[in-house]
Amino acid sequence: MSFYLEEEVEVDFQFDYAELAQRVVDFCLDYVAFPYEAEVNLTLTDNEGIHAINKEFREIDRPTDVLSFPMLSYETPGEFSFLDDEDSDDFNPDTGEALLGDIVISIEKVYEQAESFGHSVEREYAFLITHSMLHLFGFDHMEENEAKVMEDKQKDILNKMNILR
């Protein structure tokens, strides 16, 4: 599994955020029984940085907490039988790892939301990574029934990791 972390801004978390991110990504891969080694990229930025990305790629002119850019196209969320390791579009030709996608998180939003939800910065950070990983597995929350499934999975993952509110 390849996990790449890019820091566009200074990160002043009071915990090992690289280790936590790796743990959450690994746990999510195991949770959905992802059948291949995977590649995931995480970029940590600020509100200005995520605002620019949100505007460019989603045409939404404001910062957000997390953006997910899945590289795979799913017919059914969390169902991976469509993947073919002979298909070079889905796999890194150098490593053979499935290209899951990119996660972008606003550090400022992590702090803001941790305070507003009344839980730790560490928990908010882990939640946003979990949320985004589920998007990389094809889950969404546009419809009420989809949102319920995604919320239940997020809660279950964080509870099993003992990352509680």
Language model features with spans:
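Conserved ATP-binding N-box helix of the HATPase_c
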Residues: 134
